A protein has these predicted regions:
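Conserved acidic catalytic loop of the alpha/beta-hydrolase fold
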Residues: 68-86
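Residue in the alpha/beta-hydrolase core beta-strand immediately N-terminal to the catalytic nucleophile
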Residues: 51, 87, 110-113
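Conserved alpha/beta-hydrolase "nucleophile elbow" surrounding the catalytic nucleophile
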Residues: 25-27, 86, 90-92
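Conserved HGGG/HGGXW glycine-rich cap/lid loop of the alpha/beta-hydrolase fold
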Residues: 5-63, 67, 77
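Flexible "cap/lid" loop of the alpha/beta hydrolase fold
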Residues: 96-104, 108-145
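Short beta-strand immediately N-terminal to the catalytic nucleophile in serine-hydrolase-like folds
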Residues: 70, 88-90, 115
Length: 147
């Protein structure tokens, strides 16, 4: 389904019934990373799987989006779905967004799960290394990072 949130239309999949668990994917991914697990446990919880701003089937909107803006997108989805309190889980960049959400809206959380993420944003050095790695892959193929 599509949900209008802030300045964009976001893609949201809901799987199962029960207490809501909202799961946020990492950069370059989409809601489908959670789909198999959600289907497996759909009799135990209501999984709300989003495509974050600029990923999957969601619109990009403002090209300079921030973690805080993306956390507000999550809030908008919760409000549109009438969800007062959720367990929020985030993988990689989704974890950064989940933390930003927790800082601004702790009353909306029944719990927080951070998966393969950090407690803070990447350092400038780490960002530079990530861009250098991406350039190397584009020029020489992914095998350059496997060595």
């Amino acid at each position: 389904m599509k949900i209008k949130v802030n300045d964009i239309s976001m893609h949201v999949e809901i799987v199962g019934e029960g207490k809501p668990i909202v799961l946020l994917h990492g950069v370059g991914l989409d809601h489908t990373i959670w789909l198999e697990m959600a289907q497996l446990y759909q009799d135990q919880a209501r999984f709300v799987l989003l495509d974050l701003r600029g990923e999957g089937q969601s619109e990009t909107g403002n090209a300079n989006h921030t973690l805080e803006q993306m956390a507000e997108d999550v809030l908008g989805v919760l409000n549109q779905l009438g969800l007062d309190q959720v367990l929020l889980g985030g993988h990689s960049m989704g974890g950064y967004i989940a933390l930003a959400f927790a800082e601004k809206h702790p009353e909306r959380l029944a719990g927080l799960a951070l998966i393969a993420t950090n407690a803070g944003s990447d350092s400038e050095e780490k960002k530079a290394q990530r861009y250098a790695d991406a350039e190397a892959i584009l020029k020489h193929g992914s095998h350059v990072l496997a060595n």
